[in-house]
Design a protein with these regions (language model features):
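Alpha-helical metal-binding/catalytic segments enriched in His/Glu/Asp
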Residues: 43-44
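Extended beta-strand/beta-hairpin segments
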Residues: 1-38, 48-128
Length: 128
């Protein structure tokens, strides 16, 4: 399946457009690597949610962080995902599915070719 984004760059604007016509601007604090981290979080959740499960989930939040190398090429050196589950009825099943997702998520696997990867799961219900 082909995925497409078209970048447009002038002195005044920097953005890319997706096939649905959505314009995504590159601004201070929302450049290519922020979009990459968003793509990682989105792909990871989509893969996780597609897994067959017995338990119920109320909410899942995924924070993706990447640290770039300081030498050229400045690819990611270390990437981490913090996955926070709320209202997870079967925590053991959820953790097992997260591990399986790390093996199957295409964006996670692509980034893992250049970066060390960490995944941390925590449950907010446990902190109340």
């Amino acid at each position: 399946m082909t995925r497409t984004a078209t970048g447009h760059f002038t002195e005044k604007e920097r953005f890319f457009i997706t096939p649905d016509g959505t314009k995504h601007e590159y601004k201070e604090g929302s450049g290519p690597y922020e979009y990459l981290m968003g793509a990682l979080a989105g792909c990871f959740y989509s893969t996780l949610a597609s897994m067959e499960r017995k338990g119920e989930w109320k909410e899942v939040s995924i924070t993706a962080n990447g640290i770039k190398r300081t030498v050229v090429p400045t690819t990611l050196e270390h990437t981490s995902l913090e996955i926070v589950g709320k209202g997870i009825s079967d925590k053991n099943e959820f953790e097992m599915l997260v591990k399986k997702t790390a093996e199957e998520c295409s964006v996670f696997q692509t980034i893992s070719k250049v970066s060390a990867m960490d995944v941390v799961v925590r449950f907010e219900d446990d902190e109340e």
